[in-house]
């Protein structure tokens, strides 16, 4: 389904049918089904929009992690060149003070 407050165009949600609070309550079969759907979404979005060059895939599990809807859902967020000034660090940006790091060679 589409996110009600999309971060980018085609920001989508994978929502399991079973009513559970978060990703960690999914069983193995549900995880595989979600993963399959995530891959299909990635392919569909990439074919539909050639400006998409990457994806963020993630879930918020628990109030302190930013979860506000307590039914498991997984975000699939298409990314494009220039949608942020510096994408380095990716999901590390959830804690702003930790988003900058030095790569060890």
Give residue ranges: language-model regions.
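HIT superfamily nucleotide-processing domains
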Residues: 1-105
């Amino acid at each position: 389904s589409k996110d009600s407050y999309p971060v980018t165009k085609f920001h989508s949600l994978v929502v399991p049918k079973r009513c559970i609070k978060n990703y960690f309550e999914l069983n193995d079969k549900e995880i595989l089904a979600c993963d399959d759907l995530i891959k299909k979404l990635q392919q569909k979005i990439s074919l539909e929009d050639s400006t998409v060059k990457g994806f963020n895939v993630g879930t918020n599990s628990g109030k302190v992690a930013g979860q506000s809807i307590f039914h498991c859902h997984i975000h699939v967020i298409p990314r494009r060149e220039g949608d942020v000034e510096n994408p380095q660090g990716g999901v590390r940006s959830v804690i702003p003070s930790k988003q900058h790091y030095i790569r060890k060679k």
